[in-house]
């Protein structure tokens, strides 16, 4: 088997999609564009219809067995299947379809918060800090302390339940970013965890970097003004905003 094969497959698929977008913008030959467009769909190859989750495969192409979505590492990187199964930034509708449509997709999103913060650390042989942070956060199997799952909450918007996104976004911002000595929730790889907070506090987030799309969330402020490099201002105006109004 190849270590971290599921995580690599998912991230390479997204990378190939980004290359595809660049190839289109540069008007590269259609053959090149088609190649990377096809490779961007490779995430489908590790979707397990039975569990409705992403699952690692062996070199012979068979799914790794036995399979536990609570197992950290192995086919994944510092996370488990509950965390990585949402890593289809570039094709959320495709992921929704794989999981059976909107209702099953919502059920799977809900399950992340409903499944207790249990874990299998046998691959690492110890409780790595990312696992410890997930258990301390006590938000089910949602592990905001590491980057792979941080966009997941915004996916509620894609299936017509933005109020769930708004609720959980506020929960994360209020509980996992505080001024106390234990007030920061985990890794800060490439500035992602703080960038998540800045975007989310303003009320929008780039679920899929590589596009010009931002997904709406729940701003923390009644008004915020961003002074853009081109001299324009972006104003987020939410005069009725408070802790109970999202």
Residue ranges and their predicted role:
Residues 241-246:
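C-terminal beta-sandwich/jelly-roll accessory domains of carbohydrate-active enzymes
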């Amino acid at each position: 088997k190849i270590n971290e094969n599921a995580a690599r497959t998912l991230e390479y698929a997204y990378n190939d999609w980004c290359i595809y977008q660049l190839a289109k913008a540069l008007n590269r030959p259609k053959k090149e564009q088609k190649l990377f467009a096809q490779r961007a769909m490779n995430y489908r190859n590790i979707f397990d219809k039975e569990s409705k989750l992403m699952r690692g495969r062996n070199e012979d192409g068979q799914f790794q067995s036995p399979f536990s979505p609570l197992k950290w590492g192995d086919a994944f990187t510092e996370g488990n299947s509950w965390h990585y199964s949402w890593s289809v930034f570039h094709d959320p509708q495709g992921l929704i379809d794989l999981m059976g449509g909107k209702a099953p997709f919502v059920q799977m999103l809900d399950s992340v918060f409903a499944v207790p913060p249990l874990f299998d650390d046998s691959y690492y042989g110890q409780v790595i800090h990312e696992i410890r942070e997930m258990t301390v956060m006590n938000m089910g199997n949602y592990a905001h302390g590491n980057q792979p799952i941080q966009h997941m909450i915004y996916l509620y918007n894609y299936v017509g339940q933005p109020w769930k996104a708004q609720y959980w976004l506020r929960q994360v911002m209020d509980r996992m970013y505080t001024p106390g000595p234990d007030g920061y929730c985990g890794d800060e790889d490439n500035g992602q965890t703080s960038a998540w907070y800045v975007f989310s506090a303003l009320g929008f987030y780039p679920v899929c970097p590589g596009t010009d799309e931002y997904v709406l969330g729940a701003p923390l402020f009644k008004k915020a003004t961003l002074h853009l490099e081109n001299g324009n201002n972006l104003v987020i105006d939410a005069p009725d905003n408070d802790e109970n109004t999202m």
